[in-house]
Curated annotation (Swiss-Prot):
Belongs to the class I-like SAM-binding methyltransferase superfamily. RNA methyltransferase RlmE family. RlmM subfamily. One of its GO terms (biological process) is methylation. One of its GO terms (cellular component) is cytoplasm. Gene3D superfamilies: 3.30.2300.20, 3.30.70.2810, Vaccinia Virus protein VP39. The active site is at 300 (proton acceptor). It comes from Pseudomonas putida (strain GB-1). It is found in: Cytoplasm. It comes from the Bacteria. This is Ribosomal RNA large subunit methyltransferase M.
Length: 354
């Protein structure tokens, strides 16, 4: 139970190790991080009993940037037959669980295991329920079984309210056929990640205004229009006719880094390919000068020192807003639909309600 196991995007194992090591050092939890390149996972092995539990207790999962999912526990080797009996014996010292997720890694090997997991879940679930190890109770911890192979599994536990929203941290979003580009799924995932579902009507309402900087062809604009917002799309490139036909979009041929609205808007979204430091300056201007209430902005990452650069820019934003004496909440996550980038959500907390 003294290893913290984390899923991530393939190629970002080093960023997960750097991030969790920094948090562990700050909290005084001794141990070491390890990973294999392109494995889509990383581990933090705690050297003291209770270290992994303390990390999960002190950290909020939604404040971590690069991990997609986490659980504390240990690896178990399974026989070719009667895997369920071995798992039941391993779970004797675990608490009673309120839910069960079987997970695989986001790799070719992981995809090959997904069929096995689907077939294995039904008999395993029945056996756990019969043994009194699994009950229908959302307040109880979640049992997370991350299969590395059919014979090797990480048996882990995580609080349901302090871990990923979806198995493996991968949302099941359907690409809308009428959307102009697949990038639309990035913004839809961001809504789920950063805004509690019960607040959507209030914060993503059809009486709101939005700006999409670098909008062409309209993947992110589509999400704003879908919520019924009036949108100003800023881009020198063309917009999809289907969006213009809605009557909700005004397309202005302008530079997303210099254009500003005459009146403050509710939302600013931006997915421009640019150096992250310049995009950070854009965020500081829009939130700092009250040009928008909330924003979702993607930061494109450098090739090296990616976690260090993201951390530096987030700290810079925080210092900038503090110096301006304004209250802004800042969240950042590498979403499943992100590539070499992270998504930031910012919200002014000191403006009067609409």
């Amino acid at each position: 139970m003294n290893t913290l196991f984390m899923h991530c995007r393939p190629g970002f194992e080093g960023e997960v190790c750097a991030e969790i090591s920094e948090h562990a050092a700050r909290l005084g939890v001794s141990g070491y991080a390890k990973s294999k390149p392109q494995s889509a996972s990383a581990e933090f092995v705690c050297s003291e009993e209770g270290g992994a539990e303390r990390l999960m207790g002190e950290l909020r999962f939604n404040q971590l940037i690069f991990p997609r999912q986490w659980a504390r526990g240990g690896f178990v080797e399974l026989p070719e037959t009667d895997r369920i009996s071995v798992l039941l014996s391993q779970l004797a010292d675990f608490p009673v669980f309120g839910s069960l997720w079987l997970e695989v890694l986001d790799s070719n090997e992981g995809k090959e295991l997904s069929t096995f997991c689907r077939k294995f879940e039904v008999p395993l679930r029945k056996a756990l329920e019969k043994a009194g190890r699994l009950v229908d109770d959302a307040s109880r911890p979640r049992l997370l079984l991350s299969f590395i192979s059919g014979r090797r599994v990480f048996v882990g536990v995580a609080p349901a309210n302090n871990s990923a929203l979806w198995p493996m941290g991968i949302p099941r979003l359907k690409f809308p056929r009428e959307a102009p580009s697949r990038s639309t799924l990035k913004l839809e995932e961001a809504w789920h990640q950063f805004i509690p579902r019960e607040q959507w009507e209030q914060r993503l309402g059809d009486d709101m205004t939005g700006v999409d900087l670098g909008a062409s062809p309209g993947g992110w604009t589509y999400q704003l229009v879908r919520r019924g917002m009036l949108v100003t799309a800023i881009d020198n490139g063309p917009m999809a006719e289907s969006l213009m036909d809605t009557g909700l979009v005004q397309h202005l041929m302008a530079d997303g880094f210099t254009w500003q609205p005459k009146q403050p808007v509710d939302w600013m979204v931006c997915d421009i390919v640019e150096k992250p430091a310049r995009t950070t300056s854009l965020i500081e201007t829009w939130l700092g000068e009250g040009l928008c209430r909330e924003a979702v902005v993607n930061l494109k990452l450098p090739m090296k020192q990616r976690y260090a650069e993201v951390r530096r820019l987030l700290d810079r934003m925080e210092a900038t807003f503090k110096a301006r004496k304004i209250r802004v909440s800042i969240a950042c996550k590498q979403l499943y639909h992100d590539r070499e980038e992270v998504t930031c959500h910012l919200r002014r907390l000191d403006l009067k309600p609409r």
